[in-house]
Amino acid sequence: MELNPGNPIFDYCVLPCFIFLARVTDVSIGTIRVILLTREKKVIAASLGFLEVLLWVIVITQVIKNLNNALCYLAYAGGFAAGTFIGMILEEKLAIGFSLLRIISPRNGDEIANKLSEAGYGVTTMNGQGSRGPVKIVFTVLKRKKIGQAMTIVKSVEPDVFYSIENARSTNTAVSEDSPGLLRIGILEKILKVRK
């Protein structure tokens, strides 16, 4: 038995699975593309945009050719939902870019700053006034992949410390070579030989 259009196995099993998987891929790529745009990775984002739209055109063509097949609609919508979820997980795992970690400590700000500095993080501190008295504010810009490591250091000094994390849209590379915050060219950028 051949698996061609018109064959029930193809129409109601293979085609919906193809549409679902292609849609998961194209939406996941789209999620990563948007994040790369916010990180000013223009060439990589444009390349992913091309691939994303190419996949979308292939998928929508199959859906339009099979308007009487409700499974194609469900596969299209399900692929979009799953692709959004998977794209967010991928973005979390890739942890592209830098973040600003702001720590506000009424008691142990200097010790937190020293521990982070000893671990190789660039640290800036300043005195502040909180609603309950004086505080020390500690800032560090670090790779997103290193947030967990930095927070382990911070929490070892003061487990209930107040902190906030913001995405840093762009940074310069005025950081020492061994710092966990140093910008390095990624593999995809090396392949594409992208330069700002």
Swiss-Prot record:
Subcellular location: Cell membrane
Highest taxon of the lineage: Bacteria
InterPro entries per UniProt: DUF2179, DUF5698, N-reg_PII/ATP_PRibTrfase_C, UPF0316
Segments crossing the lipid bilayer: 12-32, 44-64, 70-90
Pfam families named among the record's database cross-references: DUF2179, DUF5698
GO cellular component, one term: plasma membrane
CDD domains found in the cross-reference section: YitT_C_like_1
Keywords associated with the record: Cell membrane, Membrane, Transmembrane, Transmembrane helix
Topological category with respect to the lipid bilayer: Multi-pass membrane protein
Membership in a protein family: Belongs to the UPF0316 family.
Protein name stated in the entry: UPF0316 protein LBJ_0597
Source organism: Leptospira borgpetersenii serovar Hardjo-bovis (strain JB197)
